Amino acid sequence: MPEREALAAAMQRWGFLEDPVPAAAWQWIDTFVEAYPDRTTEDARPLIAALRAEACIIPALELERLRSRDTLFFVDSVGQYVDQQPELRGLPLDRDLPEIAKEFGLSREDALLVTRLALTGEREGPALELLFPLLGHDRILIRIGAVNSRLLHGRGLQPLAFGPDGKPFEPIHGERPAGG
C-alpha cells in the first residue's frame, strides 16, 4: 500500500501534482490509496495516468457489447445522474446504478459492468464508489459522451453479426418485464 506522502511526492516528480499539495489533492490521494491498497507507489504511475486521461480505450469486442439502445440510454442516464451530484464521494452507486438500470431492463450485474466499461474500458477494478471521485465529474461526462458518440457513428446501433468465435453475437440488452 502506498503511503500518502510518498505517493504525493511521486506524483509531483511525475508532473501530476503541484507543490505544495492542495487540500483537495490529499482527499484524492487518500481515495486512491483506498482504491488500490495492493499497489506500490511505483505501480501507481500508469493507474494515475489512466485516471487523469480524458478518454479510455475500450477493447473492440467490449465496445460491441455496449452497442444497444438499452445500454446507450443507460450510460446517458448515468451521465445525467453524475451531472446532478454536487459531490461524487459517498454516492450509493451500488443502489442507484441498478435502480437507474431498471428503467432500461438491465440487470444489476449488467449495469455495473456497462458503467465500468464505459468509464475505464476494463471489466475489473476498484469499487465504483471509489472510482467516481477519482475520475471526477468532467472526466466521467467526457468518457460517457465519447462512448455514446462512438456507438452512434459508423454502424450506429447495428451490432456485429458474429463474434470472433464465429457464433452469433449479441450485445448487452435489457429485459422487458412481462406484460410491460
Predicted regions mapped to residue ranges:
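Conserved nucleotide- and phosphate/pyrophosphate-binding catalytic cores
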Residues: 1-180
